[in-house]
Regions:
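Class I (Rossmann-like) S-adenosyl-L-methionine-dependent methyltransferase catalytic domain
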Residues: 1-40, 46-76, 117-189
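Short, conserved clusters of charged catalytic residues that mark active-site
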Residues: 45, 91, 103, 157
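Residues at alpha-helix caps and immediate loop-helix transition turns in enzyme cores, especially N-
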Residues: 50, 100-101
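A short acidic, Gly/Pro-enriched loop at the edge of an enzyme's catalytic core
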Residues: 72-87
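A short SAM/SAH-binding and catalytic strip from SAM-dependent methyltransferases
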Residues: 83-100
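A structural signal for the main folded, soluble domain(s) of proteins
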Residues: 92, 115-118
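A short glycine-rich, Lys/Arg-flanked "PGG" loop and its adjoining helix->strand segment in the class I
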Residues: 102-114
Length: 189
């Protein structure tokens, strides 16, 4: 009999399901500090809750579930150059092959404004594979996650590969979370 992983979204979660995220908090403060409205691109798998969070903060959001296109040879974002002040990459890079991940990073760099920010989460730390996870915003300092049933497990992405993917960014910060995922914050030059 198959075991189903429990869902912790919206319930009293064990400590590992809800956690404080210093890099997400920094992403939020950087977005709020931008002049004018900073449109955001939310690369899924996202949730209505995440989109609603940004709309309440008065930031227009375009949501695009790149995972629907994960088998495509070409990864492209159908948006104008410099269209977004910030991009959220919810585990998408750890589900793409290395070549597709590099293509997506070039596309993200193209659609981000100068001094724009990318917040990305990688499932697992390159050694441990957590399986596919869905992350949701609680507030500007906290996130929570749950397993995604039926989604193939992400490939292991080593820290060296993460550093290479984020090389074009002016500033990059990487944190390994206690539950095993990695968060990355990159800022455009």
């Amino acid at each position: 009999m198959a075991r189903q992983a429990p869902s912790y979204i919206g319930s009293t979660a064990p400590q590992q399901a809800k956690y404080a995220s210093a890099l997400f908090s920094k992403f939020c403060s950087d977005i709020k500090a931008m002049e004018g409205t900073a449109p955001l691109l939310d690369l899924g798998p996202s949730t209505t809750r995440n989109v609603m969070y940004w709309l309440r903060e008065a930031h227009p959001v375009s949501a695009f579930d790149i995972m629907v296109h994960e088998m495509a040879d070409q990864v492209s974002l159908d948006y104008e150059d410099c269209a977004f002040g910030g991009v959220l990459g919810w585990t998408v890079l750890s589900h793409l092959g290395p070549r597709q991940a590099r293509q997506l990073m070039r596309e993200i760099g193209r659609v981000l404004r100068p001094r724009g920010c990318l917040f990305a989460i990688f499932d697992g730390d390159g050694r441990r594979n957590l399986g596919a996870q869905r992350y949701q915003i609680i507030d500007a300092k906290n996130l929570e996650f749950e397993p995604i049933e039926g989604r193939r497990a992400p490939r292991p992405v080593l820290t060296r590969e993460v550093e290479t993917l984020f090389q074009p960014f002016r500033e990059t910060r990487i944190m390994v979370m206690r539950h095993g995922s990695r968060e990355v914050l990159g800022k455009q030059p």
